[in-house]
Regions:
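Transmembrane-helix terminus/interface motifs of multi-pass secondary transporters
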Residues: 51, 228, 232-235
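Membrane-embedded alpha-helical segments and adjacent helix-loop junctions characteristic
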Residues: 84-92, 186-194, 237
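Flexible, active-site-adjacent loop/turn segments at secondary-structure boundaries
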Residues: 89-91, 123, 127, 153, ...
Length: 259
């Protein structure tokens, strides 16, 4: 059995001039249309969109919950394995002889800023409190909500979201992007990390779809994080200052506060 040579180039057609110069027009326009359609749907039919999205999320949570936890644990094992296995642990991202662009302090600052960011402001205490009243152990009947026997479960589920499992997920994606881009010389896209599986098939529609889905997932993920963070920030400022324009009669942040 022969091992194929690694793919060191990926021909992704990009625009040579105009507004989309240097970008794949198919991916850029496709992502804009998809996100724009989703936003338009949410604005024009908020109740229907909310019900459909909640139903989709509930279905995903109920059908893939155990799988999600196993995958997160697998990510941690893979990260530790890559670190301690000599063949991979000694690989220098960027190629032999390259040096880091930033100091260790700067790298750690960027990692925590991007990996935790605004969530650290309130979720450090807010999430354990939330899980103290409701978490999968409570739902399955293994713990009683808001009781002493639920403290351990509340912290367990908080650490699942913010501990090694979360960083393992971030590291897998980050390593894939960094290795295939800076060590293999491929474009800095999600599709590049899939070249060992699909090869040059990623130069066409398959690769475009992968990148479009990645863009949509990134935008939606960041939007949810910013939305929750800004909402909680506005609530905190209201509780401290009492400025009425920050909250409406239902106790939710006003549109002006969110903007």
């Amino acid at each position: 059995m022969t091992i194929k040579d690694p793919l060191l180039d990926l021909n992704i057609v990009t625009e040579t001039s105009g507004f989309y110069q240097g970008f794949s027009k198919f991916v850029t326009v496709g992502s804009k249309i998809s996100i724009g359609a989703l936003i338009l749907w949410a604005v024009t039919q908020p109740e229907t969109a909310g019900q459909v999205l909640k139903a989709v999320r509930s279905s995903i949570d109920s059908n893939t919950g155990p799988w999600y936890m196993y995958v997160m644990a697998f990510y941690i094992l893979v990260c530790f394995g890559l670190a301690i296995w000599p063949a991979t642990g000694k690989i220098r991202l960027g190629g032999e002889g390259s040096s880091p662009e930033f100091s260790n302090f700067s790298w750690f600052s960027m990692m925590f800023g991007a990996g935790i960011g605004i969530g650290m402001l309130t979720y450090a205490t807010g999430e354990p409190i939330y899980h103290f009243s409701n978490n999968p152990d409570v739902i399955m009947g293994n713990a009683t909500a808001s009781s002493a026997d639920n403290v351990r479960a509340a912290m367990k589920w908080s650490f699942l979201h913010w501990g090694f499992s979360a960083w393992g997920c971030y590291a897998i994606v980050g390593l894939a992007l960094a290795f295939f881009s800076y060590s293999r010389g491929l474009p800095l896209t999600i599709r590049s990390g899939l070249t060992p599986l699909f090869g040059r098939a990623l130069e066409g529609p398959l690769g475009h779809i992968v990148d479009i889905v990645s863009v949509i997932a990134t935008i939606l993920g960041v939007s949810v994080t910013l939305g929750y963070g800004v909402s909680q920030f506005a609530s905190g400022v209201y509780n401290i200052t009492g400025m009425g324009w920050l909250m409406d009669v239902d106790g939710d942040p006003t549109k002006i506060a969110m903007i």
